[in-house]
């Protein structure tokens, strides 16, 4: 009895273990699809692009060859097998298998268990259905499991394979006789895909033997690249490794040093470890020297944590000897190596091929001690240095540097989830919080790891409670890592770091330098130091500091005086600032205040003396300002005399403080203020660079600017009460930008503006009362730098004088200009010219040949100027609503093939009585033209008829589309918007991949049929379609179709009422790969979905990680924003009492009109993973769901295209 119980218990444990193992393995296949990036330089192999780190696979076979025996078996194949054998490569041999029409499970398994598939494409390859079915499975494996596919085109043209033409095509067509359309399309698609993989073409080799050697070498190289399973769970690691491998150039015998650069915590060490594990076996000796900075300062035998090198523990020479001893000991695995002089590394390693990774280098002396010169190492050696200091790499003349960037948002979420949940996706209910914590870590891998590990095992409520605290303080481990980088800075560089962290993160670099100029900081040098040490970046001219580094800086300042914020240098917390202001406890310690006004809960009452004691305040930034959040009942006594930056939008003051000095003022930004004027008298403004007072509706005058000799920007847009610009502006000799747009009270521009010899941009747009410009405006000696002049909307301006020939952009849209100066042809730098809505303009003189943008819309021009077709640089040409255009001049348009964007119409589509057509076509570059339909025949260039084209019709008038459309041989997309009178569609191009006839309510007939298997058809709300048209759409071989109908088409064998259908399979294993077509009848039922919950969408979104066909359906077009609904499909397999989810997809559909039933037909595919036990009855369950308040599924139908021997499919 006891023995029976033991046996029973053991059996139960085995069953449970097997169930958990299969469940886990299929869950991995569903969620964790991996990124397979080919690192080989050979063009003859290919693996598909994919997601993050792969699941480890054990390959049973090294190579699976697919070939047509009669072509290659006794000649080419035997030679290549001999070459494989010489290199130790063992291919799968199928000599024992009998070939027929179908492939048995054994061969399917052999294909799936082979690391490489090599397809030998010969003249008669396509004459064998066996070969074609092999190829389909190989291409599926390439897509699903990352199998590497290599091609050899043996005495056959790759183009014939791709297009199924020539002798190859004839053989293919014979094989297709009697086969279903689905099978033929599957074969054709596989041939096209495999032909797109660059491979070896035997016709291009003089000696076949040389090609065979090359193929065998490529196979050997792929087999040699075997990543360690230790790193399979690292998200996004492969792209890093691939790019670094390209820098390493391992096939070269040169000695090369490589730098891996990035800020602390970004994953440099992790990447280096993965790399070391993958390539170390290629070297005689290898060593990974971790955390060199600690070894250097504390000695090899004492590598405890060190926050800061407070004192020199050992002499410089001894520290270097210690480093060399550590390197040699780890390379040769000998702990007792003695190093007595600094030439030991060179002596011991110059004849050896070594791999050395020096991790965490932060001093040049460390490099000179361990790898001073490449001559120290033997041929083929590689030295890899990880550091956050770019200056160090430059100083050591290391030119091959890989900069590690932050992971993408989705990858960052996966990294966080690995540590928080032990898997790459969140638990149910945790998704929103997981995203918040990922954002809190700033997507920095160190932060993601620490926060995820901290939260692991906590309940949802504990997560919610932890979030507020972690938002305001750093975790200890994160702070310790980042703090080291801060501590080694000089005092001045530390100060700059804190300025940026608290005030200037995200600001323009040149602005920050101007704000801090003439201070105690060495700003230029400091920026270089912080940038070199990866503590900031200055890409795109903006200073960027990672959010965790920024939080470090804020924490450092907070600890300057815990509990007494008024004693700190910078104030950034809204509550602490509110307390200091409310209690009026400001001190001279405060240098800067950054207040996000929108975060103030109640109205903040400010006393008039609030700044009296802040004598050293230099930066006052009131951001995200809202009206009525700040109350200054008595105004302000003063502004700090050392103020450099004053940014205060919606300032409630109406009177400027009486005590004010602008001696240090660099930037004044006070948009939408209530002042009528600012300070009285003349202020010392030599440091002032920018003044922005836009939208100050009460402002009547600006202060005296005679001392503002360094002023660069004066922005006064929409100061609607401003009457004039003072004569003191003549002193602003460095003024580059003057914006007076929308100053409606401005009648005349002072001639003093002509002294602004540095002025580059002048905006006088929407100055509705501006009558004239100063007569002294022209001339190379006056305003010679002017490159941009905007006068659009200044409707009373009739003339303007000759202007500088340096002008690059001129906008006169909406002015009363009657003619353009004839000298315009001499403006050699003119690039953009807008004369639209110039109602008085009837003629136009020639413009310079270099112009790229020309807009003549809504003018009285009758003829397209003849010189237009000669503008070789013209890229944008617009003449919409030009009612007097004649057709004769339109013929010139057909010669303007170089114009990317062209728009020509006589009137609005609503009133023209003709349709507007948007044409997108591609030749050497993308083009987008908009014409009226009657212009197509006249205006279309010949190139359009042979180029890929998309057409979008906009109209309410026309009943049929123009005849010339039939001649567009490569028409890919066709859509209609507001085409309510369209009655019929003609036979269209076989290339058509998307037809959108949404809301064509009069459409009745469709001539011809659709031949592209990937086409997407949208006939939403086309309720007038006749029965013949409906049947044509439903029976078309298409990817997606949507049309009015209340029933599932008859050819869908498996049917069910509701939103789920089950297919019972015969007694055999589930298929490896499933392709099916589904049909769903959608209907409106208010009662069903009124309790629809948005959270349900979020849950389903989890299932789209594997298969996300979000773009699966063509929405109308660019002219309408159609509401969409989400429809999801989930496939489950049931066998032996187990339920395994294989995948899900999400489709976005335009929403039909209420109470109109529609049928949605779509094709989808899923990989079902590895085979299950073949003995038990199996079934597949297809669940569909509409994520919408008003819509549900009335009936569903299914048809299997890859037949897994389902009941009813025979």
Curated annotation (Swiss-Prot):
GO terms for molecular function: ADP binding; ATP binding; ATP hydrolysis activity; NAD+ nucleosidase activity, cyclic ADP-ribose generating. Keywords: ATP-binding, Hydrolase, Hypersensitive response, Leucine-rich repeat, NAD, Nucleotide-binding, Plant defense, Repeat. Residues 241-511 form the NB-ARC domain. Its EC number is 3.2.2.6. It comes from the Eukaryota. One of its GO terms (biological process) is plant-type hypersensitive response. It is an enzyme of class 3 (hydrolase). LRR repeats lie at residues 662-685, 686-709, 711-732, 756-780, 783-804, 805-828, 830-848, 849-873, 940-970. Pfam families: LRR_3 (PF07725), NB-ARC (PF00931), TIR (PF01582), WHD_ROQ1 (PF23282). The active site is at residue 134. SMART domains: AAA, TIR. Residues 59-223 form the TIR domain. It catalyses: NAD(+) + H2O = ADP-D-ribose + nicotinamide + H(+). TIR-NB-LRR receptor-like protein involved in plant defense. Acts as a trigger of hypersensitive response (HR). Functions as a guard of CAMTA3, a negative regulator of immunity, during pathogen infection. Interacts with DSC1. Belongs to the disease resistance NB-LRR family. The TIR domain mediates NAD(+) hydrolase (NADase) activity. Self-association of TIR domains is required for NADase activity. This is Disease resistance-like protein DSC2. It comes from Arabidopsis thaliana.
């Amino acid at each position: 009895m006891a023995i029976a119980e033991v046996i029973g218990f053991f059996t139960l444990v085995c069953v449970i273990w097997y169930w958990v193992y299969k469940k886990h393995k299929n869950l991995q296949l569903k969620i964790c699809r991996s990124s397979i990036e080919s690192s080989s330089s050979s063009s003859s192999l290919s693996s598909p692009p994919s997601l993050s780190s792969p699941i480890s696979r054990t390959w049973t076979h090294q190579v699976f060859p697919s070939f047509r025996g009669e072509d290659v078996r006794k000649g080419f194949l035997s030679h290549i097998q001999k070459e494989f054998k010489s290199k130790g490569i063992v291919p799968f041999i199928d000599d024992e298998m009998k070939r027929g029409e179908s492939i048995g499970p054994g061969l399917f398994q052999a294909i799936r268990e082979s690391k490489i598939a090599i397809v030998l494409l010969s003249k008669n390859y396509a004459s064998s259905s066996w070969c074609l079915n092999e190829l389909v499975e190989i291409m599926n494996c390439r897509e699903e499991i990352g199998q590497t596919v290599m091609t050899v085109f043996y005495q056959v043209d790759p183009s014939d394979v791709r297009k199924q033409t020539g002798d190859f095509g004839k053989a293919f067509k014979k094989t297709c006789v009697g086969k279903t359309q689905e099978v033929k399309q599957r074969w054709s698609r596989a041939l096209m895909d495999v032909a797109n993989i660059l491979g070896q073409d035997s016709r291009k080799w003089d000696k076949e033997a040389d090609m065979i050697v090359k193929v065998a070498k490529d196979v050997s190289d792929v087999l040699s690249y075997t990543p360690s399973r230790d790193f399979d769970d690292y998200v996004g690691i492969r792209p890093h490794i691939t790019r670094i491998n390209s820098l390493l150039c391992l096939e070269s015998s040169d000695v090369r040093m490589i730098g891996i650069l990035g800020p602390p915590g970004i994953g440099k060490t992790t990447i280096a470890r993965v790399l070391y594990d993958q390539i170390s076996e290629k070297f005689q000796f290898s060593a990974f020297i971790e955390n060199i900075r600690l070894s250097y300062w504390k000695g090899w035998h004492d590598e405890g944590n060190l926050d800061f090198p407070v004192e020199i523990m050992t002499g410089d020479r001894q520290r270097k000897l210690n480093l060399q001893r550590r390197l040699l000991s780890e390379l040769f695995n000998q702990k007792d190596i003695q190093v007595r002089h600094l030439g030991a590394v060179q002596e011991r390693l110059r004849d050896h091929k070594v791999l050395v990774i020096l991790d965490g280098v932060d001093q040049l002396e460390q490099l000179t001690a361990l790898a001073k010169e490449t001559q120290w190492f033997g041929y083929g050696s590689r030295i890899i240095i990880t550091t956050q200091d770019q200056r160090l790499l430059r100083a050591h003349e290391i030119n091959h540097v890989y900069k590690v960037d932050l992971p993408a948002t989705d990858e960052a979420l996966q990294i966080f989830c690995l540590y928080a949940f032990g898997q790459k996706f969140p638990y149910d209910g945790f998704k929103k919080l997981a995203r918040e914590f990922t954002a809190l870590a700033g997507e920095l891998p160190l932060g993601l790891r620490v926060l995820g590990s901290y939260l692991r095992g906590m309940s949802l409520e504990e997560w919610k409670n932890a979030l507020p605290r972690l938002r305001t303080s750093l975790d200890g481990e994160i702070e310790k890592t980042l703090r080291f980088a801060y501590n080694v800075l000089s005092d001045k560089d530390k100060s700059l770091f804190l300025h940026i962290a608290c005030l200037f993160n995200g600001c323009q670099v040149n602005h920050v330098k101007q704000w801090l100029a003439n201070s105690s900081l060495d700003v230029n040098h400091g920026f270089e130091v912080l940038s070199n040490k990866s503590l900031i970046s200055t890409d795109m001219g903006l200073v960027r500091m990672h959010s965790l580094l920024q939080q470090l800086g804020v924490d450092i300042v907070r600890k300057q005086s815990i509990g007494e914020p008024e004693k700190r240098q910078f104030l950034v917390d809204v509550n602490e600032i509110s307390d200091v202001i409310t209690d009026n406890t400001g001190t001279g310690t405060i240098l800067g205040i950054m207040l996000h006004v929108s975060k103030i809960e109640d109205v903040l009452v400010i006393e008039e003396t609030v700044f009296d004691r802040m004598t050293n305040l230099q930066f006052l930034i009131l951001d995200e300002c809202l009206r009525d959040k700040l109350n200054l009942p008595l105004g302000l006594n003063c502004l700090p005399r050392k103020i450099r930056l004053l940014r205060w939008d919606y300032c409630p003051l109406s009177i400027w403080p009486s005590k004010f000095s602008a001696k240090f003022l660099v930037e004044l930004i006070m948009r939408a203020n209530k002042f009528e004027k600012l300070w009285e008298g003349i202020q010392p403004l030599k440091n002032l660079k920018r003044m922005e007072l836009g939208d100050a509706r009460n402002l009547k005058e600006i202060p005296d600017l005679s001392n503002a000799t360094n002023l660069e920007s004066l922005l006064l847009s929409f100061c609607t009460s401003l009457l004039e610009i003072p004569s003191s502006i003549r002193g602003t000799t460095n003024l580059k930008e003057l914006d007076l747009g929308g100053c409606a009270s401005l009648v005349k521009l002072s001639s003093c503006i002509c002294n602004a010899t540095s002025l580059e941009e002048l905006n006088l747009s929407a100055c509705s009362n501006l009558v004239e410009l100063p007569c002294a405006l022209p001339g190379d000696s006056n305003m010679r730098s002017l490159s941009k002049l905007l006068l659009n909307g200044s409707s009373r301006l009739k003339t303007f004088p000759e202007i500088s020939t340096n002008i690059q952009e001129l906008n006169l849209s909406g002015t009363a200009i009657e003619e353009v100066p004839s000298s315009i042809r001499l403006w050699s730098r003119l690039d953009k010219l807008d004369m639209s809505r110039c109602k008085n303009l009837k003629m136009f003189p020639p413009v310079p040949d270099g112009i790229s943008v020309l807009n003549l819309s809504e003018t009285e021009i009758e003829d397209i100027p003849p010189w237009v077709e000669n503008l070789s640089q013209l890229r944008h040409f617009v003449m919409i609503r030009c009612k007097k255009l004649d057709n004769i001049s339109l013929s010139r348009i057909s010669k303007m093939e170089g114009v990317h964007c062209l728009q020509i119409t006589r009137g609005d589509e609503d009133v023209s009585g003709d349709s507007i057509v948007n044409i997108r076509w591609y030749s050497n570059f993308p083009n987008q033209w908009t014409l009226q339909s009657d212009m197509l025949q006249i205006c279309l260039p010949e190139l359009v008829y042979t180029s890929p084209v998309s057409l979008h019709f906009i109209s309410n008038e026309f009943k049929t589309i123009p005849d010339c459309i039939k001649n567009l041989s490569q028409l890919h997309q066709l859509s209609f918007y507001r085409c309510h009178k369209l009655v019929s569609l003609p036979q269209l191009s076989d290339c058509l991949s998307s037809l959108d006839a949404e809301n064509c309510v009069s459409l009745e007939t469709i001539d011809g049929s659709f031949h592209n298997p990937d086409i997407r058809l949208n006939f939403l709300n086309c309720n007038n379609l006749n029965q013949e048209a409906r049947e044509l759409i439903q029976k078309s071989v298409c990817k997606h179709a949507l049309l009015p109908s209340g029933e599932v088409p008859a050819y869908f064998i498996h049917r069910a009422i509701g939103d789920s259908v089950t297919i019972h399979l015969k007694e055999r294993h589930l298929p490896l790969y499933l392709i099916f077509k589904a049909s769903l009848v959608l209907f409106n039922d208010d009662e069903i979905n009124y309790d629809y919950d948005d959270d349900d969408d979020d849950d389903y979104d989890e299932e789209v990680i594997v298969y996300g066909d979000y773009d699966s359906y063509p929405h109308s077009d660019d002219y309408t924003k159609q509401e969409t609904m989400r429809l999801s499909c989930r496939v489950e397999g049931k066998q032996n009492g187990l339920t395994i989810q294989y995948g899900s997809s999400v489709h976005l559909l335009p929403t039909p009109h209420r109470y109109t039933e529609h049928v949605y037909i779509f094709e989808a595919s899923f990989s079902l993973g590895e085979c299950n036990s073949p003995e038990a009855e199996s079934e597949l369950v297809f669940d569909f769901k509409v994520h919408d308040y008003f819509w549900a599924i009335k009936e569903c139908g299914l048809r299997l295209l890859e037949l897994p021997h389902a009941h009813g499919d025979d």
